[in-house]
Structures are given as structure tokens and as C-alpha cells.
Amino acid sequence: DSVKTEESVEGMQEAEHAHDHSKEVSTFEDHEVQDRSLSDWAGSWQSAYPFALDGTLDDAFAAMAEEGEMTADEYKTYYQNGYKTDITNIDIEGDHIEFTYEDGKKVGSDYKYIGYYIQNWSTGTKAAMYRFEAVDRTSGAPIYIEFNDHMIESAAPEHFLIRMSNESFDAIVDPENSW
């Protein structure tokens, strides 16, 4: 089973951008992390992967290159690898997630909250990975999923990173390069 990843881009979700940027954190005390419900990510989300491929994000990569340590092409390759997925859309309502694949196939399941995992990055920062498990393990929907939206408490995100596996949470490998 391969791990699938996806990120949505700002402006591609159903709801208006409405969170407080002060809640976005990459350094925090572990005890500050709060449990969250799937409803925090409610809405219709679109993968950023096609935009990394088709040139839509090229201006962003160029701007990053002006400030960063890589060229625009290196950033583009880096993000293409991190965003890579065959899922085009994710729809979240209540405890239910429906995944739409490139071929149009749709699969979904209700999910139960398992808890959070604190991911320590090599950069010295960290993230709260909110974990959910499919209730219907035979639906074809990913069984184990983790959300990261750079927040540690309930809030409506402007985007999120999601990692998935049908094997286990431990099978979600290479967190530095697979978002």
C-alpha cells in the first residue's frame, strides 16, 4: 500500500478564509495541543498537486527562490514531490470524508478521531498531526489519515496537509518529504 498525500491551496475551499493567523504555530509546548474534531476541516477541498504541475504556482516558487536557498525549479520539484497524489478532491461533512480520484472514482467513509501525534521536524519545529481512522474499513477509502493545518486548537484552516495509509499510522513514512 502506498501512502497518499494531498494539500489544498488557499481559496480553493468552500468556506471563506476566517482563521486567526496567530493560531498557526510551528513551535509550541506539547501540553498546548488540543483535541479537534473532523468538522474543523469541513468543506470541499481541491488538491494543490495539479497546480504544482501546470505552472499555476510558478510565480509562488519564483518568489520563494528570492528569499530561500533553492531555485524556482528546485522549489517546484520539491513541492511536486510533496503534493503528489491521485486524489483530486476531498469533501468533508460531519464525520464523513469522500475522496475523488483522477479517474472520477469516489470512495468515502465515516471517520473516528484517534488522537494527535506530535511530529518533530529536522528543522527544530514541530506539528500536531490529527489522526482519524475509517469506520468502514472495506469502503475503499483510506483507513488511516492524519491532518496537519499548522494549528494546535480548533479553528477553520485555510489549507491542510493530509497523509494516508491503508496499513497503519506507522506506515505513513517520510514525513519530511510526504506531506
Q: Each PLM stretch: what is its role?
A:
Residues 46-53, 96, 102:
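Generic short beta-strand segments
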Residues 42, 49-56, 83:
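Sec/Tat-exported extracytoplasmic proteins
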Residues 58-111:
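N-terminal glycine/threonine-rich, aromatic-flanked beta-hairpin/loop signature
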Residues 28-44:
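N-terminal helix-cap/turn-to-beta initiation motif at the start of protein domains
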